[in-house]
C-alpha cells in the first residue's frame, strides 16, 4: 500500500525509535523490547528483513487506514478463497465503519498501528496469507484449488514491477544473515520469506504464547511455491514456525 500509493519508495527512510507512546498507550518494536536497541533510520527492505514494527506503524500513519484496507482487500484478505473445503472462514479486515458499528467507538491511530502490522482486529487464515504472499511477489491474486490439474484464474492487481522487486528484496533479506528467519540463512537468495508473531486479542504476552507465523516463496527469482506455516500459541515465528517451514521445503525439494 505504501509503495503503490506513492507515500514511500525504495529510498524512503523512517527512524526506528524503539517505541511510540501516545498518552497511556505504548507501541513497541521487538528489538527494543527484548534487547533495548534500535535500528536507526531504515528503508522498507530493511524493515521487512528485520520485521521492524516502528517502520510499519509510521508507514501506516502516512498511508492511512482506508488505503491499507483497500489493498488488503485487493490481495484477498477478508474474503473466502473458494477452496474446495467446508467451513472456510472469510477472516476480517477491520474498517472505520466496522469498528463504529461493532464497538460504538471511532477509529483511533492505535487501530491503524495494529492494522499496519497485521494485528488488532485483523484475522486471516494461513491460506489467505499464502494467497496474499503470492500477490506480493507476483502482482496477481489467484484462485485457490485442491485439484492439481484445475484451471486457476488470476487477476493482475496492477502493481508495478519495480515495487514487486522492492518487496521481494526485503523478503529475500529476511531469509539472509541479519534477517529474522535464521532457519533459512543457508538457502541464500533462493528463498523469500516473512516471519510473524501474532498476539491473542485482549491478552498480554505473558498470559499465553502468541501464534507463530512464517510465509515463504520459493524459488526466490520466480516463485513456484508459496508455503505458509501457522502454529497456534507456539511462540515467535522465527523460532517456532521457521524450522517447520524449512523442514517442509526441504522435503518438497527432495521430490521436486
Residue ranges of predicted features:
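Short, charged, low-complexity patches
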Residues: 129, 237-246
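Intrinsic structural disorder
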Residues: 132, 178, 241, 252-256
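Short, gly/Ser/Thr-rich active-site loops of penicillin-recognizing serine hydrolases
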Residues: 152-155, 244-256
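Beta-lactam-recognizing serine transpeptidase/beta-lactamase-like catalytic domain environment
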Residues: 2-229
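Hydrophobic residues on the short alpha-helix immediately C-terminal to a glycine-rich phosphate/catalytic loop
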Residues: 1-2, 248
Amino acid at each position: 500500500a505504501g509503495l503503490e500509493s506513492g507515500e514511500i519508495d525504495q529510498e524512503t527512510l523512517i527512524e526506528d525509535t524503539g517505541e511510540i507512546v501516545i498518552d497511556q498507550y505504548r507501541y513497541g518494536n521487538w528489538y527494543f523490547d527484548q534487547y533495548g536497541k534500535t535500528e536507526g533510520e531504515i528503508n522498507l527492505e530493511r524493515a521487512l528483513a528485520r520485521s521492524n514494527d516502528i517502520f510499519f506503524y509510521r508507514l501506516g500513519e502516512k498511508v492511512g487506514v482506508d488505503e491499507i484496507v483497500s489493498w488488503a482487500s485487493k490481495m484477498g484478505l477478508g474474503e473466502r478463497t473458494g477452496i474446495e473445503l467446508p467451513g472456510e472462514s472469510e477472516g476480517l479486515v477491520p474498517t472505520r465503519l466496522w469498528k463504529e458499528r461493532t464497538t460504538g467507538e471511532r477509529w483511533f491511530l492505535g487501530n491503524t498501528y495494529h492494522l499496519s502490522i497485521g494485528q488488532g482486529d485483523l484475522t486471516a487464515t494461513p491460506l489467505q496469507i499464502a494467497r496474499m504472499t503470492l500477490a506480493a511477489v507476483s502482482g496477481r491474486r489467484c484462485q485457490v484449488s485442491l485439484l492439481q490439474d484445475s484451471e486457476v484464474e488470476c487477476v493482475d492487481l496492477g502493481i508495478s514491477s519495480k515495487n514487486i522487486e522492492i518487496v521481494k528484496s526485503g523478503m529475500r533479506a529476511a531469509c539472509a544473515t541479519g534477517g529474522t528467519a535464521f532457519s533459512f540463512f543457508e538457502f541464500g537468495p533462493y528463498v523469500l520469506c516473512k516471519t510473524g508473531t501474532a498476539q491473542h486479542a485482549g491478552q498480554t504476552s505473558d498470559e499465553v504464547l502468541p501464534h507463530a507465523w512464517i510465509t515463504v516463496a520459493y524459488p526466490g527469482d520466480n516463485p513456484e511455491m508459496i508455503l505458509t506455516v501457522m502454529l497456534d500459541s507456539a511462540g515467535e515465528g522465527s523460532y517456532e514456525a521457521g524450522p517447520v517451514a524449512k523442514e517442509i521445503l526441504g522435503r518438497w525439494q527432495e521430490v521436486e
